[in-house]
Curated annotation (Swiss-Prot):
Gene: fbp
Subcellular location per the Swiss-Prot or TrEMBL entry: Cytoplasm
Annotated keywords: Carbohydrate metabolism, Cytoplasm, Hydrolase, Magnesium, Metal-binding
Record's catalysed reaction(s): beta-D-fructose 1,6-bisphosphate + H2O = beta-D-fructose 6-phosphate + phosphate
Keyword Lyase among UniProt keywords: no
Pathway: Carbohydrate biosynthesis; gluconeogenesis
Descriptive protein name: Fructose-1,6-bisphosphatase class 1
HAMAP family in alphabetical order: FBPase_class1
Gene Ontology terms: cellular component: cytosol
Domain of life: Bacteria
Entries under Pfam families matching the protein: FBPase (PF00316), FBPase_C (PF18913)
């Protein structure tokens, strides 16, 4: 495969599909540059004194790691001055972050989870950044939270970076999924995988099995059938994988198939799940569908959900299409 840079890919996509105007290309490049900076901070680890807790909580009531706050600040500072955004929203902030008046206002909205899987930071397991781009309403004067509450099908870009043995950036602009690897010597993103595809069938699943006693019947039935192996109703053996880092689990699925599940359960019946719709489930669902997979909340396509609030949570089932369809059918016949 011819090795091309992220910038060259974006320019050629614009020529072919006319879907990446200059302002959007700038936005993608700035986010990619911020991910390089985060990768550098993550890579320093204890040497950079960035490990451990920040002794604070985010809006979700989760204890923040130092790198959560550092990564959030990197993304805010990189993106607020360029004139391509109207506002930003983050897992780490209760309200939206409008672009300061001293900078020009752009026509896009950026949402992100600055450091997904941060429970893994101190033990050197892969973590990452997830982001989603929406179009702002025409003629917007001042961004409000309601402007962000668009269905996932309205996304114009989605992607994530994984900070692991290599740093990779996985991206869709609505025409397939491409993977770029950070060349640390040159400081550039180079395309290393084109048109990633998720096989429709799989023998791997990812779920936190320690919660099994709390699962609702459709999930319990589905997992029990897989665990029964060759002598069970599925007639084949399955392997379980669970990294506790959504970006790492989804990246594996994009490369070799599988199903990722984070269902609602009986621990907190009033909560519809743990993962956030706007900046976790939606961008990952967009990527997975663009790679030929499927993504639902057990009842409907994730990208069809109309959000009601910025930090809304949803159950998530995504990955190989035939498996997602099967577990979704169990929810509909419960």
């Amino acid at each position: 495969m011819k090795r091309i840079s992220l910038t060259q890919y974006l320019i050629e996509e614009q020529r072919l599909h006319n879907n990446i105007p200059a302002e959007l290309r700038l936005l993608i490049e700035v986010v990619a540059r911020a991910c390089k900076t985060i990768s550098h901070a993550v890579g320093k680890g204890a040497l950079g004194e960035v490990l451990g807790s920040a002794q604070s909580e985010n809006v979700q009531g989760e204890v923040q790691k130092k790198l959560d706050i550092i990564s959030n600040d990197i993304l805010l500072e990189a993106n607020e001055w360029g004139g391509h955004l109207a506002a930003m929203a983050s897992e780490e902030m209760e309200t939206i972050h409008p672009i300061p008046n001293r900078y020009p206002m752009g026509e896009y909205l950026l949402l992100f989870d600055p450091l997904d899987g941060s429970s893994n930071i101190d033990v050197n397991v892969s973590i990452g950044t997830i982001f989603s781009v929406l179009k702002a309403a025409d003629g917007m004067q001042a961004a409000k939270e309601a402007d962000f509450l668009q269905a996932g099908s309205k996304q114009v870009v989605a992607g994530y970076a994984v900070y692991g043995p290599q740093t990779v950036l996985v991206l869709t602009t609505g025409n397939g999924v491409q993977c770029f690897t950070l060349d640390r010597e040159m400081g550039s993103w180079v395309m290393t995988q084109k048109n990633m595809q998720i096989p429709a069938d799989t023998k791997e699943f990812a779920i936190n099995a320690s919660n099994a006693r709390h699962w609702y019947p459709p999930v319990k039935r589905y997992v029990d059938e897989m665990l029964a192996g060759t002598t069970g109703p599925r007639g084949k053996d399955f392997n379980m994988r669970w990294i506790a880092s959504m970006v790492a689990d989804v990246h594996r699925i994009l490369n070799r198939g599988g199903i990722f599940m984070y269902p609602a359960d009986a621990r907190e019946p009033d909560k519809p799940g743990k993962l956030r719709l706007m900046y976790e489930a939606n961008p990952m669902a967009f990527l997975v569908e663009q790679a030929g997979g499927a993504a639902t909340d057990g009842q409907q396509r994730i990208l069809d959900i109309q959000p009601e609030k910025l930090h809304q949570r949803v159950p998530v089932f995504l990955g190989s299409k035939n498996e997602v369809d099967l577990v979704t059918s169990y929810h509909k016949t419960k």
